[in-house]
A protein has these predicted regions:
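Polybasic (Lys/Arg-rich)
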Residues: 79-173
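Core beta-strand-centered patch of the WYL/Sm-like small regulatory domain
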Residues: 1-95, 104
Length: 173
């Protein structure tokens, strides 16, 4: 991990083994997503930014090749909620209603840096806005807090969650 950190700091290309395959990577950032550590990197083979589970990276070797990368893309990962974050997709707004039973938790620890309160109700329930890049960034969180979270918008997110619940209940009854 020290070699990876050094490569990020010096913007140096690395070679490593990931999932039993040799990789050439441009390491960009180490990030904790859902309690797992990931290396955010530009992978030459796929010609895209990828997330690799940090503990699965083996035999790291620094190369004598330095690189530059768009800092805006790298800083975009600061708003990632989980590994479903998509760096090349423009973030879009979702709005949620948070019942008073859970609102304090989201005020204490925001979902990500884009969270803002749109409305506070007398009973301490709130409406919030958050920016995401993929529905799967937020669906697990919403489903874990049901019935205390409701989707205000977009409607497609609401339909996806409803479909997930219908599928679940069809298998359990």
């Amino acid at each position: 991990i020290i070699k990876v950190k050094n490569a990020i700091k010096t913007k140096t290309k690395i070679e490593c083994i990931y999932n039993d395959k040799k990789r050439e990577l441009y390491p960009l950032k180490i990030l904790n997503l859902d309690s797992f550590w990931y290396l955010i990197n530009y992978d030459l083979e796929y010609n895209e930014i990828r997330r690799y589970h940090l503990n699965s990276i083996k035999k790291v070797e620094l190369q004598d090749i330095e690189f530059d990368f768009d800092e805006e893309i790298i800083s975009g990962f600061d708003n990632a909620i989980n590994a479903y974050f998509e760096p090349h997709i423009k973030p879009f707004s979702i709005e949620l209603f948070l019942d008073k039973k859970v609102s304090k938790y989201f005020l204490r620890k925001p979902i990500n840096q884009t969270q803002r309160v749109l409305k506070t109700y007398e009973d301490e329930s709130i409406d919030i806005e958050v920016f995401i890049t993929d529905f799967m960034e937020i669906i697990p969180l919403i489903q874990s807090y049901l019935p205390y979270i409701m989707v205000i918008s977009p409607d497609e997110l609401n339909k996806t969650i409803k479909s997930n619940l219908e599928e679940y209940f069809s298998k359990t009854t």
